[in-house]
């Protein structure tokens, strides 16, 4: 198992090409890919001919991220999370809604609700964009001022309504009641209590209690003899501890592990599954430590209801799957693995660039992520003796690829999953025609918790290349919607600058350190504790420097005399008229700082 963890760390920032090359043996053959594409195209054609799309699918088709109006709505939804007061909210709404051309969308959707929303946005934009001159302008200005509170409430209501398309209920009781209709059709559920990472320990205790209460309520619906036929729950580890990062590992293992373990024991007693949700890449290594510690609890022996979510866009996904299989063998049990595409792509790309990391922890293009998903799915199906595969996708091509691989490997014990409010018609087709179990991932929470979840879903599915965005768009042919990602990957798309190159050609970005990698931290720590004395300066009298913490001498420094300082200042005068040489020296100094960063860190910790 340690072998897989070492590989995982070594390949965290490998190139997309290297990651996919290592999984080439798992990729479908050209003949299989052709058959998969045919089946996927047939699925899409049948959906368009027979199915009724959901409101959210119609909304995304009309207002995807390919339109200025769609971008405005995404920005508005995301920014409303951080608006501190009514005045700022009014300014934000005016900035995002007034300039957009809502009229061109009027009457374009098949949904009355979507068209009504468009009409409301059009009227709002006209009020906010009123000219401010003349008597008419004064009158319209008054209407604008009087209308701002109403508009503010209306926009918040629209955002809330959008969020409710994705949320099953505000309480677990309401969600369970609403789920009964789909359960009667043969669907299963996995409930997710909405909420972002805990900020305080009080938050964490509150989330823990909410999870425990939800498990108790879900248990009442768990009538099946097998865990895979019962509802389940998903939990976020970041909700159970306010400092869920590697720098607080000891505290996390002491506090978070018992909390997660207690929830697992409750789920075991209830006869339901419990999945650990995937989060940002920086938390992956620590999450595996927590997962192993929880699953190693003797009282959880012979329980096959523990699950882990793996994000296929992550470059380490295949190694995580190998590690989970090894853990299942070690503990002699079966682990559920939910394979998802991934929900934090934009964040991961931006953080890697800002932090100057060696590369990206995620695959840089959607076709590469789709290819990786298919290869990881093949791996999971081959491990079905210890893994219960759960394939979360709304993409017809991905579903066709999984079905093809399952038939080839003669694996029947797996399930598909979809988000509540998304992919309903596609999964209904899979359930009815292929007899494969389908589980609905159902968020549960209050209005105050909706927007962050909504933004992630819209960013995932709102892009013009998204399957969900295109599936009911008649202008996009079925074979294009269900295109083979292995072929699409050959097309040259926009290149995302690597972290080191974001300021090119002017200069290279400064180098950062992945402080979520235990091996990076161990290297920095080794430099810090290594006995070393530093000496700086070539002129003047030497003065010893001591650590303020231990009084040990850590080196010496030489100070210039007044005469020496005057001589250097005089010599520096011509320096002002040689910008090229000065720039070269500064670049050289920056390179030296970077190449000796570990020594500087060590010195700083001794002198602090």
Identify the function of each model-found stretch:
Residues 1-508:
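Positively charged, amphipathic and often flexible ligand-engagement surfaces
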Residues 469, 473-606:
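Short, structured beta/alpha segment
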